[in-house]
Amino acid sequence: MRTKSRFSEAEREAVYRAIFERRDVRRNFLRRPIPDAVMRRLLTAAHHAGSVGFMQPWDFVVIRNHGTKRTVKDLFIDANTKASARYAGAKGALYRGLKLEGIEEAPINLCVTCSRRRGGSSVLGRSTVRATDLYSTCCAVQNLWLAARAEGIGVGWVSILDHEKLKRVIGVPKSVTVLAYLCLGYVSKFEAQPDLETAGWRSRIPVGRLIHEESWGNRIQDKRGDGDAHHQGLHKNRGRGKNQTGRRTTSVERQSAGRSLRHDR
């Protein structure tokens, strides 16, 4: 298949929009079913993730049955009861008020697994860092998540589950690792910011605090005041619609620059 080497401006903006507007969704699910053709597109996008040694270690268990969802919800309740005991006082009250899953509300639940034996005992590129197959499967999850956002479908990752018990519920072999349990469905709206940020659990860290030049500790924020390396030129010309090179800024650049400024305050 022949591919174009360049994205159009509209295509490029769409990619960044999907990234910036991706949300971990636990509420606002609609009963509207996800068509099989759309679900196949999402899974194909996931399947086109990069993987160590082209191992493609992922499998996808698509769950629609309400009885299965109810059983998984019970696993969540059990695990969440134990998890909530870790937090006391105001933090505990805040935790107990969070909605951390949409298992029964979402039309589709999706279990993403990693077959760590796929490709044999010697997978190209995995001999030193064995966990690269798990990292590869995470790339598949992110591909699906961004494609889902482009389709108007919300995705929520349910991380508070006992994976060994989950494997018994949906028949995953012992030799296969459960990596993610996701809730998928069309939603009435996507929130403007992550739920945990809205609830006051945590804030987004300014990216400049996380970027080190050449060696650990040499942070760009020490040199560049606002702490967002990706949008330095936009800040310099803010309000004039041009970036550092003089090129007219696109809407996604203006939006993401605004996000950066809000997070850095």
Report the location of each language-model feature.
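C-terminal helix-cap and adjacent tail motif
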Residues: 2-11, 18, 25, 181-225
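Generic structural concept
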Residues: 43, 66, 261-265
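Phosphate/pyrophosphate-binding loop motifs in nucleotide- or prenyl diphosphate-using proteins
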Residues: 227-265
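Glycine-rich phosphate/pyrophosphate-binding beta-alpha loops
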Residues: 48-53
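Small-aliphatic-rich amphipathic alpha-helix that forms the alpha element of a beta-alpha
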Residues: 42-47, 110, 119-169
